[in-house]
Design a protein with these regions (language model features):
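Conserved catalytic core of nucleotide-sugar-dependent glycosyltransferases
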Residues: 1-61
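C-terminal catalytic/acceptor-binding lobe
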Residues: 34-112
């Protein structure tokens, strides 16, 4: 069945690509205790250790337990956020494009 979509109001979705996603800092602050982390100890060419920053694994591939489906980094992040009480929204009035090995372009709303 078709679901009516307004072109002036964000729409809640299950997941989306993070390449054009606006994510508030508080999302990362909330999730950082829920994900694996590691203290950077990479040695540079001069033999000294760089900044010992903590790196959090927000974006990883995973297997979704309920469906046994492989989740890309984008979908893994969206699932992680939803599992911690968050919601994902799209702006249906936006036209998006992504260029990598292939060009992807699209719009959520079909305009007659």
């Amino acid at each position: 069945p078709e679901i009516p979509v307004r072109n002036d109001k964000p729409l809640e979705v299950f997941a989306g690509g993070t390449g054009m996603m606006l994510i508030k800092r508080k999302v990362f602050d909330k999730l950082k205790k829920k994900v694996p982390s590691y203290e950077n100890d990479v040695v540079d060419q001069a033999g000294s250790i760089g900044i010992k920053e903590v790196i959090h694994e927000y974006f990883a591939t995973s297997i979704e337990p309920e469906t046994n489906r492989l989740l890309s980094e984008d979908y893994h992040f969206c699932r992680l956020w939803r599992m911690n009480g968050g919601k994902i929204y799209i702006a249906p009035w936006m036209d998006l494009g992504h260029m990598g090995s292939y060009l992807f372009e699209g719009t959520f709303l079909k305009v007659d």
